[in-house]
Amino acid sequence: MSHNSFGHLFRVTTWGESHGPAIGCVVDGCPPGIPLTEADIQPALDRRRPGQSRFTTQRREADQVRILSGTFEGVTTGTPIALEIQNTDQRSKDYGDIAQRYRPGHADLTYDLKYGIRDYRGGGRSSARETACRVAAGEVARKILGAGITIRAALVRIGPHGIDRSRWDWSQIEANPFFCPDPVAAEQWAVYLDEIRKRGSSVGAVVEVIAEGVPAGLGAPLYGKLDSDLAAALMSINAVKGVEIGDGFDAATLTGEDNADEILAAPNEAGGPHIFGSNHAGGILGGISSGQPVVARFAVKPTSSILIPRRSVGRDGQPVEVITKGRHDPCVGIRAVPVGEAMVACVLADHLLRDRAQNGPR
């Protein structure tokens, strides 16, 4: 199995399976001399960690990260950074019933068709457990980006229920189990998701990621576009079925005069970005960052691991009925919030290093 790495100069390779002894990643391309310890990475992993509310999987993992290489006395050396997270709460017996059955909506069938073998325990390599590695790598990326670039994400929709953007409050993100910026919507979601959970079903969600302080000039025309790399990175997250930048598909409903972000002023003598009248483009024009906030959204499908019987076939081709036991998220979009932040951080760090390599320090 190839394609376990992403990035160009800032390159991340993840490894491990859901029910293996450990998961981890190797981060290559991090410059030397950057302070980095486990304490810098752990808070982000704690945000993604399972079992923190009734609305996420009850699998209990500490997700304690260990730095195995690439630092000396708390500072990066410029060599590959290896990060490891132990798996401690696997329950493989829950998956015995699907060893010879394909779960509808999962990667079981396609993995078997491609490789002729699959690890059915918790989905193996296709499990969202792998995203813990991305979150760890994302914290290394944030150290490269520095404090001037802020990357934050929020859940803006669960199923048919969206937020009221007039109530958007970043301080509410950590005050509820949904990473929701609208406290009223968060209360409504709790009632709705309880109903979904008690039925043994699941529901999808939309995550919005906003990166502020991104300098102008990141990205390149045509095949090196910043937005195409962001879209690819976000689409690679488990269960993601759609990505949009800025207004995305809503841009198709606008006229040219409404969609074009007017440029109101050039930078003053103190520097800073150009001033725009709007940000329909999501901070990227022609594949290159404009200095405005970079805005992306991605849609997460409902997990197919549900207690409601579904029709399928077994490896022998015979019809079967599948009920997925085990511990699963009723809405995987919740824990995708820190994953989205991490992937945006990795892409921005990669493009920042690529820009420096071509143009030198700005």
Swiss-Prot record:
Cofactor binding: number and manner: Reduced FMN (FMNH(2)).
EC annotation from Swiss-Prot or TrEMBL: 4.2.3.5
UniProt keyword annotation of Ligase present: no
UniProt-listed Pfam families: Chorismate_synt
Binding site for NADP(+): R48, R54
Keywords, ordered alphabetically: Amino-acid biosynthesis, Aromatic amino acid biosynthesis, FAD, Flavoprotein, FMN, Lyase, NADP
Catalytic activity reported: 5-O-(1-carboxyvinyl)-3-phosphoshikimate = chorismate + phosphate
Pathway linked to the protein: Metabolic intermediate biosynthesis; chorismate biosynthesis; chorismate from D-erythrose 4-phosphate and phosphoenolpyruvate: step 7/7
InterPro entries for this protein: Chorismate_synth (IPR000453), Chorismate_synth_AroC_sf (IPR035904), Chorismate_synthase_CS (IPR020541)
GO biological process, one term: chorismate biosynthetic process
Cofactor: FMNH2
Binding site for FMN: R125, S126, S127, N238, A239, G286, K301, P302, T303, S304, S305, R327
CC annotations in GO: cytosol
Single GO term (MF): FMN binding
Disulfide bridge map: none
Alphabetical list of NCBIfam families matching this protein: aroC (TIGR00033), PRK05382.1 (NF003793)
Family: Belongs to the chorismate synthase family.
Job of this protein: This reaction introduces a second double bond into the aromatic ring system.
Subunit relationships: Homotetramer.
Protein's name in the database: Chorismate synthase
